[in-house]
Amino acid sequence: MMNFADTLVILNEDAPCELLRKKYAQMLVPTVSVSNFKKNKQYKTYNNVFLYTYREYDFLWDLDDNVLHKIQRCLNKSGVLKLVLYISNTDGGDNKTHDEIAKRLKRECLYSGFINISNEISMAENGIIINVTAENPDFLSNEDDDEGNSSDGEAYQNAEDNKKVVNRVCANCTCGKKTNGVKLDKVTINEKEVQYLTENAVSSCGNCYLGDAFRCASCPYKGLPAFQPGENVKLNLDNEPN
């Protein structure tokens, strides 16, 4: 389960990303468009930055206004960037083209100062999803650290930043919170389904709750509407339609 505390979400300006913006707003997670993010000179620092873009990705190659480098500067030490790019089948291209895009994204993250970069391509409805995860190094100089935490009034601020975010226990919890009294909810479902134990709706790729456009081909949530992380979701586990 992703902890959305101290997280910024950057969204490209298209219809699917607008739906995501509303979804994150309901969870009190600050969001900003790519264009507005690029206009700001200084940024508050975050532990996590998500960048979602639907079909459009040319702005990621812009050397004159490098958005990846700006993201790197507004991340805390050891902060994580997660970039999610959806490419529709109607945009053309083949597996080789998609591999080249994924490799270039990884290379651009490296050039922008990130480390521990990984990428993954998964099939989605009517297209593919490229997931890139990169980490901000923890060996930044004091000068860089002071610059990133400037308090001169130009820092990016969002009114939602100061609102409380509820912490939840991860499904694969290793910190001991789950074993210290957090109980699983037992959910009873109809005869076409089975009993199962669920604490929260969890996905291995982290995109399942966003909706079909961002789900992989084998996603068990396929066909279900988007939902909030932490929301209990009932799955139809047999092969018959509802």
From Swiss-Prot:
<keyword id="KW-0004">4Fe-4S</keyword>
<comment type="subunit">
    <text>Monomer.</text>
</comment>
<feature type="binding site">
    <location>
        <position position="208"/>
    </location>
    <ligand>
        <name>[4Fe-4S] cluster</name>
    </ligand>
</feature>
<keyword id="KW-0963">Cytoplasm</keyword>
<feature type="binding site">
    <location>
        <position position="219"/>
    </location>
    <ligand>
        <name>[4Fe-4S] cluster</name>
    </ligand>
</feature>
<feature type="binding site">
    <location>
        <position position="205"/>
    </location>
    <ligand>
        <name>[4Fe-4S] cluster</name>
    </ligand>
</feature>
<keyword id="KW-0408">Iron</keyword>
<protein>
    <recommendedName>
        <fullName>Anamorsin homolog</fullName>
    </recommendedName>
</protein>
<dbReference type="InterPro" id="IPR046408">
    <property type="entry name" value="CIAPIN1"/>
</dbReference>
<keyword id="KW-0496">Mitochondrion</keyword>
<feature type="binding site">
    <location>
        <position position="216"/>
    </location>
    <ligand>
        <name>[4Fe-4S] cluster</name>
    </ligand>
</feature>
<feature type="region of interest" description="Linker">
    <location>
        <begin position="141"/>
        <end position="162"/>
    </location>
</feature>
<feature type="region of interest" description="N-terminal SAM-like domain">
    <location>
        <begin position="1"/>
        <end position="140"/>
    </location>
</feature>
<dbReference type="GO" id="GO:0046872">
    <property type="term" value="F:metal ion binding"/>
</dbReference>
<feature type="region of interest" description="Fe-S binding site B">
    <location>
        <begin position="205"/>
        <end position="219"/>
    </location>
</feature>
<comment type="function">
    <text>Component of the cytosolic iron-sulfur (Fe-S) protein assembly (CIA) machinery. Required for the maturation of extramitochondrial Fe-S proteins. Part of an electron transfer chain functioning in an early step of cytosolic Fe-S biogenesis, facilitating the de novo assembly of a [4Fe-4S] cluster on the cytosolic Fe-S scaffold complex. Electrons are transferred from NADPH via a FAD- and FMN-containing diflavin oxidoreductase.</text>
</comment>
<feature type="short sequence motif" description="Cx2C motif 1">
    <location>
        <begin position="205"/>
        <end position="208"/>
    </location>
</feature>
<keyword id="KW-0411">Iron-sulfur</keyword>
<dbReference type="InterPro" id="IPR007785">
    <property type="entry name" value="Anamorsin"/>
</dbReference>
<comment type="similarity">
    <text>Belongs to the anamorsin family.</text>
</comment>
<dbReference type="Pfam" id="PF05093">
    <property type="entry name" value="CIAPIN1"/>
</dbReference>
<dbReference type="GO" id="GO:0016226">
    <property type="term" value="P:iron-sulfur cluster assembly"/>
</dbReference>
<dbReference type="GO" id="GO:0005758">
    <property type="term" value="C:mitochondrial intermembrane space"/>
</dbReference>
<dbReference type="GO" id="GO:0051539">
    <property type="term" value="F:4 iron, 4 sulfur cluster binding"/>
</dbReference>
<dbReference type="GO" id="GO:0009055">
    <property type="term" value="F:electron transfer activity"/>
</dbReference>
<keyword id="KW-0479">Metal-binding</keyword>
<dbReference type="GO" id="GO:0051537">
    <property type="term" value="F:2 iron, 2 sulfur cluster binding"/>
</dbReference>
<feature type="short sequence motif" description="Cx2C motif 2">
    <location>
        <begin position="216"/>
        <end position="219"/>
    </location>
</feature>
